């Protein structure tokens, strides 16, 4: 069916005195296979991911996807055929991008799923690539297939559609293209406290759409004046300059603000590789206790250097999966923690597991626990965001047969109960903090609601050792920087294997970044103070603004260029 879809050869009705491209070059570009554009788009989107240090390719990464879909729109055939082709092409883009960017998923399937490397990569490309491909289809293909191609007005409509959809579109792991592109551009990423990390796609998708406008003039021969191109470019650089200016002002305000309640943070990165543990749940309890004794010894050594100012409260942080037992079910280890806290006059923040119910009907929870310097438990938080196919089986209630098949064939597949409370712990009357666990931070509302509940510091307790030597830590750090800026709150990334780091309210590092699979300690004093964030308080209104702009520009575009084409 798809083999009979043909691309029309162009007719260039507009003749200019100074053409941008030769007729031969125009025809060659026009007839470039959409699958070639799909491959190029997938490569660029893969390079846009953390870990490659090429994230700025995101400025143009979506242009090949747009050109690919322009080819689809010009295909002969029914709407259904073009729809199917667009879905397959977007899946192809997502598959290539996923295989390049999600090595951490491939590594997990290979190591813990006991699958050959080629099969693991195929699962990443087909499975995770499908999620990325569907996202690209909704963001890019839907407006192209449903709107009549205009000369100008369909482009701002598509931009606002992208910005609106990206705020709410469901994902197993919530990430966004705008944040990925500008995650290490300090001046520009400060606008995330106005429009969110996803809103930064305004600058990357906006540039790609302007380049598409240039394509329409240079290759398709549309009668688009240089004045229109100039106005579009001026608008882009005006927004870019405003964003950079706002970022410079915000950074100077955050850096220059020295007041607040001091807290001395000691975060231990013990380098507990969990490969053996994760692939062997029956690992001897004695070895887990040995690890715990090593952790206590490392903590004692780290606490031997007191804060510069006396009387400053201390917080000792242990990452996820380094505590050897269920905290509330094992009195011996719980008492050891309380005793250590009292002896060293330090609060301790740790992650553990808990369960309730009857034998055969247990409900498990991942939890974080704060123990005060008096040895008393100050509170617990139940993990909200569960890792798909690691801590939960998505849609298991809808497909019970498939869920049971996965339980029988995937080693170490756990099923946890999600928490519902965005807990903020009280360390003192002046100090409140939160402790989201691992992938909790991929859901934007988690840290947002914790901060709105009074948290002045978010401590992310993570277990990433099972991802091995991959880019998992780079992905986590990028997302945590978005959350710090979006909510204007410091964030501590405490990982059991690296790369632990303390991130300030402006998204910049306040401590050295510890190495991957290296032992180390972060020991620093930070002053905590509540800060205002427009996006944190009015996120819903930002989303509504994108929708209103989309509808308004759609109405204008329809009046100017009949964009709805009979709809």
Q: What is each residue range found by the language model?
A:
Residues 2-7:
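Extreme N-terminal basic, low-complexity initiation segments
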Residues 20-253, 468-469, 483, 495-506, ...:
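Membrane-embedded alpha-helical bundles of multi-pass enzymes
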Residues 49-66, 97-104, 269-270, 311-326, ...:
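Short, conserved active-site loops that position catalytic residues or coordinate cofactors/metal ions
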Residues 104-124, 138, 146, 168-197, ...:
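Active-site catalytic loop in hydrolytic enzyme cores
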Residues 120-125, 273-283, 406-407:
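Short glycine/proline- and acidic residue-enriched helix-loop micro-motifs
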Residues 159, 315, 322-323, 329-350, ...:
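CN hydrolase (nitrilase-like) catalytic-core segments centered on the catalytic cysteine
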Residues 247-389, 424-431, 435, 439, ...:
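Soluble catalytic regions of membrane-associated enzymes that act on cell-envelope
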